[in-house]
Amino acid sequence: MIREERLLKVIVAPHISEKSTIAAEENNTIVFKVAKDSTKAEVKAAVEKLFEVEVTGVRTLNVKGKTKRTGARFGRRNDWKKAYVTLKEGSELDFVGGAE
């Protein structure tokens, strides 16, 4: 069993993009930014506990930070981890709250 304190630190934020919106509409899949050291089991447990939905699958990937330039200096954004969480048929998460 994963401690509740850890579950609250696993999910960082929902990741909103054109690709994630299409995935949500067509495949009932929600995309989250998650902690870099989190596992698929932790992500599944966190989503089920926090949002009270049933998860059928979790796919994770590491996103490399982009190199950015400010004047003559180059810097690099941080690497981060993304999780595609597939929900059971009939389950739904709404982050926008019906705003249209």
UniProtKB/Swiss-Prot annotation:
GO cellular component terms given for this protein: ribonucleoprotein complex; ribosome
Organism the protein comes from: Pseudoalteromonas translucida (strain TAC 125)
Subunit structure: Part of the 50S ribosomal subunit. Contacts protein L29, and trigger factor when it is bound to the ribosome.
Xref: InterPro entries: Nucleotide-bd_a/b_plait_sf (IPR012677), Ribosomal_uL23-like (IPR013025), Ribosomal_uL23/eL15/eS24_sf (IPR012678), Ribosomal_uL23_CS (IPR001014)
SUPFAM superfamilies (alphabetical): Ribosomal proteins S24e, L23 and L15e
The keyword Cell cycle appears for this protein: no
Gene name for this UniProt entry: rplW
Family assignment from sequence similarity: Belongs to the universal ribosomal protein uL23 family.
Protein name: Large ribosomal subunit protein uL23
Assigned keywords, A-Z: Ribonucleoprotein, Ribosomal protein, RNA-binding, rRNA-binding
GO biological process: translation
